[in-house]
């Protein structure tokens, strides 16, 4: 029986002053262990999602933990039958998750971590303001009962949203969550700096909650968007029902795929009327290449990760 692919989401806020020099040996460690996916490294830490065999993931994690600064790096695992990534990359960044606010440093100041088993009790408190720190397209697929949707299109918009809608003097308790924990951890650091006193965030993010909390006890509704070819996951981190439009990157449901405006690899109901003719023709050609490669049982370099050029 073919062994499932292990998907590992990992991050750690830690000062990596030599992150530029770290890029090449990290990339080599990924290659040596047969790892696909992308890792981001910056002065503030490391972040990314990778995939590979059981032995490959164990080998990469052992390599990372051989660095004393990363010895306690945590990662969350799930499984899939097909390789969710096609490339192996290590990217140098200013931030491992981009908030765009100078001085925010989770290495120095961060909110209170809440274990998944304790999360339901916290968010059931009527005095707690529950905020989803993810982007609008992620929230539309699933979120926690009673959570506020900031309707942001990028994490950079989060600080302005907080300033415009909430007051530390009024909103005494704030709880936040995101996919794997990294965005809400950084958001908690930002909010503490803005004067909010009681700031909580879900340790391990939604993924850890879906893994550990039984579905019958869950306050989660819907599916959770993930940044790989699975698109979404459900409780127990099994693959969800959504696909993704390669034109606009919007998650698409079975209903979307039944629409007359859906064409695999070309358009969906969310973008069919906004694509230029040039982009549409390019997408049609690309899709033909993918289908031809599939018919020949050959991998195609764009595969499900293909993204059409921006219309901007």
Swiss-Prot record:
GO terms for biological process: tRNA modification. The active site is at 178 (cysteine persulfide intermediate). Its EC number is 1.14.-.-. GO terms for molecular function: oxidoreductase activity, acting on paired donors, with incorporation or reduction of molecular oxygen. Keywords: Oxidoreductase, tRNA processing. Coiled coil: none annotated. Residues 124-218 form the Rhodanese domain. Residues 293-312 are annotated as: Disordered. SMART domains: RHOD. The keyword tRNA processing applies. SUPFAM superfamilies: Rhodanese/Cell cycle control phosphatase. The keyword Oxidoreductase applies. It catalyses: uridine(34) in tRNA + AH2 + O2 = 5-hydroxyuridine(34) in tRNA + A + H2O. Catalyzes oxygen-dependent 5-hydroxyuridine (ho5U) modification at position 34 in tRNAs. Belongs to the TrhO family. This is tRNA uridine(34) hydroxylase. The gene is trhO.
């Amino acid at each position: 029986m073919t062994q499932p692919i292990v998907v590992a989401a990992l991050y750690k806020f830690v000062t990596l002053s030599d992150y530029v020099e770290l890029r090449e040996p990290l990339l080599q460690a990924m290659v040596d262990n047969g790892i696909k996916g992308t890792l981001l490294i910056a002065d503030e830490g490391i972040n990314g999602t990778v995939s590979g065999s059981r032995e490959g993931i164990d080998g990469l994690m052992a390599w990372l933990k051989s660095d004393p600064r990363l010895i306690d790096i945590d990662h969350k695992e799930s499984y899939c039958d097909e390789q969710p990534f096609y490339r192996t990359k290590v990217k140098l960044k200013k931030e491992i998750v981009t908030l765009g606010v100078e001085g925010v440093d989770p290495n120095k100041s961060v909110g209170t971590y809440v274990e998944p088993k304790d999360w339901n009790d916290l968010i059931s408190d009527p005095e707690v303001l529950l905020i989803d720190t993810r982007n609008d397209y992620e929230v539309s697929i699933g979120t926690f009962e009673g959570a506020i949707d900031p309707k942001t299109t990028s994490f950079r918009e989060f600080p302005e949203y907080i300033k415009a809608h909430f007051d530390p003097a009024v909103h005494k308790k704030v709880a936040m969550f995101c996919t794997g924990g990294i965005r809400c951890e950084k958001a908690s650091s930002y909010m503490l700096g803005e004067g909010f006193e009681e700031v909580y965030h879900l340790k391990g993010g939604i993924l850890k909650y879906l893994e550990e909390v039984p579905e019958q006890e869950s306050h989660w509704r819907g599916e959770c968007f993930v940044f790989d070819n699975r698109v979404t996951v459900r409780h127990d981190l099994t693959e969800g029902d959504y696909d993704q439009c390669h034109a606009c990157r919007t998650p698409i449901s079975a209903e979307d795929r039944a629409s007359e405006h859906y064409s695999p690899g070309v358009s969906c109901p969310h973008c069919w009327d906004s694509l230029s003719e040039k982009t549409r023709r390019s997408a049609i050609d690309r899709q033909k290449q993918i289908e031809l490669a599939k018919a020949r049982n050959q991998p195609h370099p764009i595969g499900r990760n293909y993204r059409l050029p921006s219309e901007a």
